[in-house]
Structure formats: structure tokens, C-alpha cells
Amino acid sequence: MAKSKSRGRRAEKKSKKEESSLVHDSEVPVQESGENSTPSGVPNTFFGLVDSNELDYFKQAESTLNINAFDSDEDRQGFINSVLEEAQGKELKLVTNQICSKLMERLILFANNKQLKKIFKQFSNHFVSLAFHKYSSHVLETLLVRSAALIEKELAQTEEEKHEEEEEGEDEKDDVPMEDLFISMLNEFKPHLTTMIDHSYASHVLRLLLLILAGKELPSTTTSNSTLRSKKSKIARKMIEIKDNEDFNRAFQTPESFKNELREYCQTISAGLDTKSARELSIHKIGSPVLQLLVQFEGLVDRERTFWHLIFCKDSEGKDSTEESFVEYLLSDSVGSHFLESIIKNDGARPKYLERLYKLYMKDRVLKLAKRSTNGVYIIQALLFKLKPVEVEFILDEIIPELSELISIAENQNLDLANKLIDASIIRGNYRRDEIIDQLFKKFAPNYNVENPQDHTTTEFIENILQLQGSTLGNTRDDWPTAEERKRALFLEKLMEYDYKFVICTWFNFMALPIERFIQMCFHGVFCHVVEKALIVEPEESKKVQILRKRLLNIFQGQIVGLACNSYGSHIVDTLWNFTVLLPMYKDRIASELFSESHKVKESTYGRLVWKNWGMELFSRKKYDWKALIKQQEVEYYGEDNEESTTSKRVKKPIELKLERLAEEKRRKEEQAEKAQSGYIKRKLDELTGSGPEKKQKLRGRNRN
């Protein structure tokens, strides 16, 4: 009731009085109010407003470039030339305007080398102001990436290419190498570096400068894990449909002078920091990513590792109470834990530095940190791949027995921890592999009998991991699969790759699902990959598993054509070709389904691909050749060229053993008959020629006489 009373006439009169007082108070020059609204040390240059008529023209130009409906690259370049001519002398006004800044960014992306240098020169002496501005900072980032690409191109030029360019640009007497222009810009920023670190817009420019100077990969401005832009900026960039060109997502060759510039940048920034301010920056939402890069790159130019020792004590020192409380804050804070994780993962520190922090402040409470699912657990995951083997095994010994308790299905916690444990175990020669498998089954399928699976197995395994209830599975509103569903599906695929027991368990769960529900999974954009990854066959397959494989294939009966004509299901039908190895009857059944509705299959884009991959032309015209493909597949599957070695790799079927017995008996009888026939013929010849053994003895006897 108190809130409703405050909305009466008295409140209105009071608000009017406050507004009038604000009006009187604000009757000061605009320039002064602008200066007072910005922090000290932050430039706030006003470059003017874009005229309304010009604004309409530039709006239209921006939409034309966005649509990109030019007949050729020459037409587009001609349009860009005309827009740049119109924008000449107005570049600074345009980049600080919300709409026109998008146009300038597109022009920079499409500009040739000469145009790029021209724009760069127009920004000269104003780079600092542009870096601190909301809109121009984004334009500046794009310009820096294109400039880095041009510097690499100029470094790679031969003398002949340079001479040709000089002849082409004889009219341009003041043509300066891009490297010199870039260094001139770097000098502009040096007095403002400490202010840039924690500024909302300038910090992103500083990050990019550090990446270029260090010769590291320049990340995309739209990907979710980009170190270049903030989350809001990446979303906005996608909405305005500005796409990066080929200069992004790659590293560039840099000149030797850049190493000196990086050293000066590091020295300038470190000179303005002490331990207290450095630690404050490491947990600062905006400054922390910049400090991460400084710690990561300082090793290129500073053997003393100044930034590291500003934040942490020297490696020769023991436990320090102040440092201990700071590390504890890092381990419990979201920004701080991300900072610590980043410098561990990105080789930002020497191994002995990390080992010191681990032994002093983390080793005796590994399990407790692993239970902090929003911060501490990420540090443990990073340490699994950076510490010595002995320490890694110690962490595994601590966590593996409690793995089932650490994973939370409902809250979707620590799936990444299970992933990293599996990877660390594999690297260490499958260290405690069986225990990891037992813990995962204990968590996700507690009622499943791993050694002797039963027909009454429920769907608990895939339900606990994929959370099918409440997912987008079966939705008719064309809902996109969520990021959580992708994460869960990838985790299940990882388990199936890790051990075949998870594949068998997944088969039983598929068979326990209603057929309609299973087919919905095959049509789902994420869960279809789970089905596809589950359709694998072991080389040495037992009879029991082969029977289970046949039972799983029965689910697909009558569904093949629908799957083949679907963008997701078609991949599953393709996978069934290998999944039906040694099961020619099932392979023939699937091919017959496709052939029975050949017109429908051939009318579909995806169906035609399935038709080709299954060799259906041979099936319909030359079935003998199609069966030869099946035989060839069996030989290739076992990786042997002869039937003897192939059959010795697996348990032979009773019919195969019987056929071999009959063949052996037939061969033995033929040999006996052949011997008998040859003996009979030989005796007859001896009788006719009189050259038997007895006559030879008589002759020998007569000769002696």
C-alpha cells in the first residue's frame, strides 16, 4: 500500500520540482558536462554530427553492402569507391555514429590495400579517442585486423613486386609502409595504456593490439569463445549481419620491430601497477582478460616474468598468508577462477610456478575444489593436463572414487569433469579405467547389470544423460536444439567412444523406448548423432552381441524410407550399411525397402545420396554385383585379403563348419580316387611293356652270369 500512495499528486509535484532544479543545474556548456561525465584520463573528442541528408545516403549505402547483390566484384568495388569518395573527410564523424559506423566497418572489410592505408591515415592522431568510443572502437578493431594482414603481405613482397607497386602508385609520393603507420599508432596509445586496461571499449582494442604484437591468432568477432569481443558485442554483430573475412581466425607474420613494441607495452603497463592493483585487475570483469594476455605473452620479451611476480610470490618463497587469501578468492570467484584457469591452460606460467601454487594452496583439498561446480572444478580440470604425471595420478586417485557423487544430473554439473577425467586417464595409459566406468554406470544407470544385461533394461541411462523428458524432442514448433542438449549428447558420444559397454547399454535403452520416440530421436538435430554413433560393430563380436544387433535392426523395419528422405535420418541409413556387416539378410531387407519406394527416395535430395551410398543401382539391375560388394565389405571390415585369415578372426557359424567338413571329405575322396586311378594305369603300362620290377631283377641276374 505504501507504494501505491507514492504515486499521488504530492509525488508528481515533487518530481516536477526535482526536474526544474535539474534543468537549472544543467545550464552549463555542453562541452563541460561531457568532460565531467567521463572519468579522468579518458579522451572525449567530439567529431561532429552527420547531416540528415548525408545520413540517409549512408544508410542506403550500408543496406546495399549488407544485401551484397552485386553482379560482380568489380561492380561492388566501384560502389565502394564512390561511397569512400563521398565519405572523404567525414570518416571520424561516421565512425562515431551508430549506423554509419557499421557502414565504415563494411567498407574496411571490402577495401583494397590503398583504400585501407588512406582510412588508416585519416584516423591518425585520433586513435585514442576512437578506441574509447562505443561505436568507433568496433571499427578500429576491424581496421587493426586488416592492417595486420597487410603488414604480413608487405613483409612477404619481393623486390620486383615492390617495384611494380611503386610504378603503379607514382602519383602517391607519401606512400608509407603499413608497419610504420602501425608503429605510429602504437605510440599514440602508450600514454593511455593503464587507462585502457579496464575500460569497457578500449580494453578490447588493447587485447587485439597485444595479440597482433605477439603474432598470435586473431579470433573471430562472432564465435562464442572469442577473446576479442564481449558477449553483447558478439550477439549484436550477428544481428547486424557483419561477417568476418578471411583475415580473422588466423595468426600473421610480424616484423622484428613488433617484439620491441610488445616489450615497451609490457614495461609501460607493469610500471603503473603494484601487487595490490595487479591482483585487483585479475578479478576485474573487464581488466582480467587483458591481464591474462599480458601474463601469457610476457614470456616472449621478459624472462623475469614481471606480471606473474606482481600477482604471485616468487617460486622460491613458501606459503604467504596474503597470497593464500588471494588464491582462495580466485578459486571461489567466477572471474578470478576464469583468470587462473586461463593462465594455466594457455601456458601463461612456467610449470614450476604452477606446481608451487598447487602444492601450497590446492593439493590438500583437491576433492573440495572439485565440488565447487561453478569455479574451483575448472582449475582442477586445467591442472590435470599441466602437472607432472605423479601429481595427475594423485588428483585422479582423489576424484575417481567420488566421481558418481560429484556429477549432478538435475543441475547438469561436472559433466566436463567426467570428460576431462576420461582424457587424463587415457593419456596416463588408461589409468583406473575400470573404476571410472563403474562410477559412470553407478551414476547414470544404477539398475543396469553391466556383466549380464537383461531384456527388461529401462531407459534410465539415456534418460539420465540426455534428459529426454522436457527436451525439444518431438516438438512440432521447429524449436532449435538447445546448447544443453548438444552438451549432453556429446558427453554420451564420448562415453560410447571410451568403452563398448556404453554402446551395448545404449542399444538396450533404444529397444526399451517406444518406437515412435526412438524415430523422433533419429529426426532430431542433436540426438540423431547419438543414434548414429551408437551404430558401431566390434571386430571380434560375440554371438550374443550379434543377436542383440539384429534385435536393434528390427526397430528400423518399415522406417527406412522416411529416414532416407530426411536430412538427419539419411546419415543414420548410410551408417546402417556398415552396421549390417555379416548380416546380409538385414542388408537385403533395408535395400528392398528402399527399392519398393524408389520413386519417393529418388525425388528427395537426401534420398538420392542414400540410394547412391547403398549401391541401389546395382541392387536393382545387377544383384550379383551388389552381393559382391557385401563380400568385399566383409573382407575390408576384418582387414584381411584371404578368407582363411578372415574366418580365423571370428567364431565360425555351424553352417560354415559343416560346409568345410563336406568340402574336406570331398577333397579326400577325390585324392583317393586319383591315386587309385594312377596306380591302375601304371600297372597296365608295366604289363604291356614288360618293364615290371620282377623282369628287371631277372635281367640284372642274367647280366651277372
From Swiss-Prot:
Disulfide bonding pattern of the chain: none
Keywords: Nucleus, Repeat, Ribosome biogenesis, rRNA processing
Basic and acidic residues compositional bias, start-end: 15-27, 665-674
Region entry Disordered, spans: 1-43, 665-705
Pumilio-type repeats, residues: 86-121, 122-157, 188-224, 272-308, 321-359, 361-397, 512-549, 554-592
Bias (Polar residues): 33-43
GO terms (BP aspect): endonucleolytic cleavage in 5'-ETS of tricistronic rRNA transcript (SSU-rRNA, 5.8S rRNA, LSU-rRNA); endonucleolytic cleavage in ITS1 to separate SSU-rRNA from 5.8S rRNA and LSU-rRNA from tricistronic rRNA transcript (SSU-rRNA, 5.8S rRNA, LSU-rRNA); endonucleolytic cleavage to generate mature 5'-end of SSU-rRNA from (SSU-rRNA, 5.8S rRNA, LSU-rRNA); ribosomal small subunit export from nucleus
Biased composition (Basic residues): 1-14
Compartment(s) where it occurs, according to its Swiss-Prot or TrEMBL record: Nucleus, Nucleolus
Classification via InterPro entries: ARM-like (IPR011989), ARM-type_fold (IPR016024), NOP9 (IPR040000), Pumilio_RNA-bd_rpt (IPR001313)
Pfam families to which the protein is assigned, alphabetical: PUF_NOP9
Main localisation: nucleus
Gene Ontology terms, MF aspect: RNA binding
One cellular-component annotation, GO: preribosome, small subunit precursor
Entry similarity comment: Belongs to the NOP9 family.
Function: RNA-binding nucleolar protein required for pre-rRNA processing. Involved in production of 18S rRNA and assembly of small ribosomal subunit.
Protein name: Nucleolar protein 9
Gene source species: Candida tropicalis (strain ATCC MYA-3404 / T1)
Lineage summary: Eukaryota, Fungi, Dikarya, Ascomycota, Saccharomycotina
